[in-house]
């Protein structure tokens, strides 16, 4: 309505010329050039007259756009002047000024005293220009414009984006997808958008909101379990589960390496079990010699037994000498480790209680053959248990 009233007033003014200094030459096309006195007399006859000429220039703008003053002046000329009722001046002023809409009160900013006939039809004021907000409001809700031409303020609810209402089928699919994957890649998001008839933006926003909801739920569960113990209905939060699983894994790893010590000292046959358990330390030492090629740890025990050397250092460092290395370390290191110093060394012949019968000294083979001094010193040593037949490790058949 604002634009229509403005252009109607411009067409009314466009066909007429301002004949007087007051600018009120709008009585009709038959009398375009009228003297000022005649215009004032005709203007006093109208229903919208004013008292003083000083007020006429001020209120002429509003009466031009008012509906009661925009009818043509031809019927006024045909009617006799006494038929027009004399207007009450103050009331008509107030009603004419109050009936003007607030939006259209700003329309004629051009002063009527200055003659601007060509510029009236082309001038566009700032409030008439189309803005981005106005175009959005027109496209979304065309009924927001009121009858007086005033538009709703931009911060009202009509300018906000409408809330997306998801159907139950869409929510089921979205929840199912969120259960398997909390973050969607773009190809999967495009596929979900085509499947559910939604836009990618809607799916992305739904997943963002769902992640925030999940985070809030986990936080509330964590606070509830820390204050009042774990809830009976729900599982503990995911960080607590992962830490518990990690601790369990560490516990199983440590329990694998905590091998129980053999009950050798509690058995009646202390000598046999003491020597068998003593094999473990030389095995570790021999493996270290095998892989690191360093000097053997048990050099003072291995190299000399009762003042007799059992081999060169090169042979002792080699893997072939491993079997002999175990046996050589027995007489000096074994009894002293377990506090069996009171036992003489010649009792080693009676040590094997559960193994097969002993082999004669002539049948020693493997690394024990090239050492005749070894068999002479220890004729009754159970070499089949000490790694004589298997240089890689001892056969502990009685355990």
From Swiss-Prot:
The keyword Glycoprotein does not apply. Gene3D superfamilies: Homeodomain-like (1.10.10.60). InterPro entries: DUF4074, HD, HD_metazoa, Homeobox_Antennapedia_CS, Homeobox_CS, Homeodomain-like_sf. One of its GO terms (molecular function) is DNA-binding transcription factor activity, RNA polymerase II-specific. It comes from the Eukaryota. Residues 91-104, 221-232 have a biased composition (Low complexity). Residues 18-164, 214-244, 352-399 are annotated as: Disordered. Coiled coil: none annotated. It is found in: Nucleus. Residues 81-90 have a biased composition (Pro residues). A motif (Antp-type hexapeptide) lies at residues 124-129. The keyword Transcription applies. Sequence-specific transcription factor which is part of a developmental regulatory system that provides cells with specific positional identities on the anterior-posterior axis. Belongs to the Antp homeobox family. This is Homeobox protein Hox-B3. The gene is HOXB3.
